[in-house]
């Protein structure tokens, strides 16, 4: 446990380490051609018509390759948003959560086909973890951070990169902590041992993102995203606190030895062009978490809020799953979980 925390802390310090070209083994990636390297869902009737949401699934632990297509189907079918899901892929163009993080293989350079679509996106839902991307792909993220468009950052997005080109504002490096309002400082809840129950912050219960949110629960543990050196920022609005539970069971008792900590908050980021982006950071977000109606509703309400469409948020708008959704558990015990590289098309339905 201590070793994992140390690795994460080292990674946060190394966020802007720039590897030399000789340290990187560039993969020749088979993108499979347009339309085969990512998923697209056309929006049905709904208030989101004409808006394009890009969802990014690029991590090794929390099964975003399953949750992001599900969320895209909900947004497209029930809410009218055009949705595109982008994945981190291996050299064969397969969605591959088993690719090692850079601290396990420092020669690894990750690749997300279709990332150019960030240029035209109206909103981005972002779930990545320790992605070591080319400078060109990092720049696409940086340009989006400067665009004034909304960003919904889930779970590991606050340690979503490893090294590479730094994001600069006013000539200074901008950390993901500064961008999102917090970063990973360790597992407050027991990692893969203690579930999370969300507690709505009383003074902010009227926030549009919390409309219709009645229950928040998931098996991912509570992250500690703030400390004495970097307390909860004054420019952030806390929406939900996460109470660690004593086990992973739905009806488990709270772990009274651990206080609830912020797990969902909003802020406004002003990029290099002076444009202001609405940001929601929600540190839940495993695929199993998204079985919970409250987790789905909060995230989808966040899209409306980010796009300044608060007038379209209603407690009775459905966030029901479209089709079957039986997600795998989080973890890196891939063989036991049955997690293997798969073609993008396997995640469509």
Cite the ranges covered by each PLM segment:
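Helical hinge/lid and interdomain linker segments adjacent to catalytic or ligand-binding clefts
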Residues: 39-42, 54-56, 60-160
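Signal peptide processing junction and immediate N-terminal pro/mature segment
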Residues: 16-27
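Active-site rim elements
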Residues: 58-61, 129, 192-198, 214, ...
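Bacterial N-terminal signal peptides
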Residues: 4-18
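Nucleotide donor/acceptor-binding cores
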Residues: 51
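A glycine-rich, often tryptophan-bearing local segment used as a flexible ligand/cofactor-contacting loop or short
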Residues: 117, 126, 130-212
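Extracellular ligand-binding/catalytic regions of CAZymes and related secreted enzymes
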Residues: 26-48, 66-67, 77, 93, ...
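Catalytic beta-strand/loop cores that center a nucleophilic Ser/Cys/Thr
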Residues: 30-38, 76, 82, 109, ...
